[in-house]
Swiss-Prot record:
Its cofactor is Zn(2+). A motif ('KMSKS' region) lies at residues 605-609. Its EC number is 6.1.1.5. This is Isoleucine--tRNA ligase. NCBIfam families: ileS. It catalyses: tRNA(Ile) + L-isoleucine + ATP = L-isoleucyl-tRNA(Ile) + AMP + diphosphate. IleRS has two distinct active sites: one for aminoacylation and one for editing. The misactivated valine is translocated from the active site to the editing site, which sterically excludes the correctly activated isoleucine. The single editing site contains two valyl binding pockets, one specific for each substrate (Val-AMP or Val-tRNA(Ile)). Belongs to the class-I aminoacyl-tRNA synthetase family. IleS type 1 subfamily.
Amino acid sequence: MSDYKHTLNLPETAFPMRGNLAKREPDMLKHWQDLNVYGNLRKQRQGREKFILHDGPPYANGSIHIGHAVNKILKDMIVKSRSFMGYDAPYVPGWDCHGLPIEHKVEQEIGKAGVKVDYKTFRQACRDYATKQIEGQKTDFIRLGVMGEWDKPYLTMDPKVEAGIVRALGKIVAKGHLVRGFKPVYWSVVGQSALAEAEVEYQDKTSTQIDVRFTVVDRDAVLKTFGTSEGEGDVSLVIWTTTPWTIPANQAVSIGADIEYALVQVDVGHGAERMILATDMVQGIMARWGVEDYKVLANAAGSALENQLLHHPVYDKQVPVLLGDHVSLDAGTGAVHTAPDHGMEDFVVGKEYGIGTLNLVKADGTYTDAAGEFAGVHVYKADEPVCAALEREGKLVRSEKFRHSYPHCWRTKTPLIYRATPQWFISMDKLNLRADALEAIKGVRWVPAWGQNRIEAMFEQSPDWCISRQRTWGVPITLFIHKETQELHPNTQELIEKVAQAVETGGIDAWYDIDQNELLGADADQYEKVLDTLDVWFDSGVTHDSVLRVREELGQFPADMYLEGSDQHRGWFQSSLKTSIAMNGVAPYKQVLTHGFTVDAKGYKMSKSLGNVIAPQEVMNELGADILRLWVSATDYSGEMSVSKDILRQTADGYRRIRNTARFLLSNLTGFDPDQHMVAPEDMIALDRWMVDRALQLQNELHEDYGNYAFLRIYQKVYNFCEATLGGFYLDIIKDRQYTTQADSLARRSCQTALYHVAEALVRWIAPILSFTADEIWQHLPGKRGDTVFYETWYEGLTALPEGFELGRDYWREIYAVKEAVNKCLEEVRARGEIKGSLSAEVTLYCEGSLAERLNYLGEELRFVLITSEATVKPVSEAAGVEQTNLEGLLVKVTPATHAKCERCWHHREDVGQNEQYSDLCGRCVTNVEGPGETRAYA
């Protein structure tokens, strides 16, 4: 037996089978950095239409987590895909650098500003801390394969950006949207600062709920309102609250004008008394209290009780009954304890009745001396002493613990309170900001579409935005207010620009160092400098002005896209929209894409206590960044994104299919030079020509999917193309032709031309997702090419089949179905042990009409398509005892091959051994080894 290996075109490539990504990717990163890929791409694309994805800045604190990775990978996939579309798509990453968490970290290291260190030193320490955090995060983002302006990111602590933030404030002031007010705001007693809605998150908390008697002052007048004198004992209006600590600040009780109230005779353990409760809630309240014996004496409308006076349950004072629209029958008693200091609805109803605030709680959460017996007590610890005082006064009806969802600071994770303080607000309604924003929302493309409803609902309910904070590390509110009138300086716009210029060179310290006398001249003594800082959401929210309009490589407003997690509907998307509408009257973005949160395989949130945290750094070090990138693509980002080690292992399996397909393509392009060996479309063998057309069809679909950010569909289509179209059909069929025909024959070069076109297209399709692998493939492709795939646009070498082409798309679609049916039959026979493989079989296909015509069209080459040693087409009338396949109208008979096996091509052919010199070869192989070589027309 001879060895014919040297006569075959065996696959060969230096492209490794194993990705070994964790080791290879860092080398690829260095390669990109050495080439300055991002910088060169910017030069190449200069003058092209821009696509600007504006980066929502992550907070400069801590290591990146899997959510950060999802966000940056999605952005990178979009930016890269737009680059392949021919756009100039720069990406300038940013960081949010000011705010409370950094202050806390620095306080732990060097102590409080103004106590242990001076403010300037403290701010510099904050700047140093943020810089260090940014470097750590930047390293991880780059490791993910994200390309961008990493050497010149935008930082909200950069003096130029800080100056831009100051100027943005000036524009909002100039437009009349800034107001100063004394209102209840979310207040962090830990941070001693106000918080905006976007900085609030809800967590479960154990609280005390209490029912409290407010005894009426004029019992006779109240009984007269109810039209009865029946019953005995005191008459009390009973409230229910989950914040006992606010009772000292109580100034009224609110009821519903249109709610009916019942006068109830009852004994809850303190003797006979009469309670006023919402009629519809009496039964539920009594059940909650465990009281069975009670009697409704009379009923009255809430409106009839307006302005009745009640005894405060703790202090020696009287409080009125008010009518409020916020009173509901969802929970409680139908009467609402009203403390304007500690609730927006309370504040609003109090304002309607001319009731102001008491300011009993200091910034640190302790009561002032005006709170009497509670002076110095912290609100976190006040429930117990307040309940004790109520018990002492005989006003506590019931008290019990319960768990509920409660607002917490999203940075410090500590419970918040509502506290009335003088603050600066952007008014939502003074100049129709709310209405204008709701109108602008309609003109934005929201991906997914439900994002529009979500942000609309938030804007409809959004209170005035409190933008002031009482912090050290933040952009200052650079305003001067008159000491007596509290009005802004008449030259505020001119002053803001002067301050902005100073900040541009000296950073935010310039505001504190500025000479007020020099700036204000003769007015200096009449004005005081505002010492509040801006909400960090304002910092990031105005980057459409301080970064997008200012950075030369961006220079476009509005941005084409904002992309963040779904929590940013109430965060960055909202703050950006509010400021942009206030400044420009238009939305700052044309499209907004949101992605869901990452959860484990069971849908649980990631937490160290559950042990289900997937750290991106670990994934990159074990599996490689491309596996993480592929997982992002293969997951529906519109909802929660499940990730676990098992899920990532499954992703790695999908990766291997794509990599192995690429390796097959590359290994079969050995000896192929596209400049010399490329076959023109009209000269290609029919199957090859169809393959190129199929790739073009898919490329058109993928272009559309990339345009619609449908990354899951892209992954599925590319995977199926590799698995089914290539692996299960085309590559299977062409192996014989590729390996056995003469090296420079049309049969082989046509096949290599198709493989080359497919490889050129595939490497670009996957590059936005599998960036490292794509560039590795790129370096192993034959022919002259640029240094990296990322300089390219979509491949333009794919050609469509001409109209009316006989062996067109429908033809090969039917052949594909036939091959699937035949494969099923072959597998059944192989499983019975009658054949070893498809080449040790002969098949007879029984069919009629057009199907028979189509199969016969291939003639002798039908066996190459079916990968059998013989394939014959016969009429159905001859199919006695042959079973129908799953393809209607086709019956298949499989029999073991009876002829000798060719040692070169492994086909069993009757002409094996007819040539004395090559006694173990079939005639076709003899022709290919020594003769002119075989010719193929179809497959």
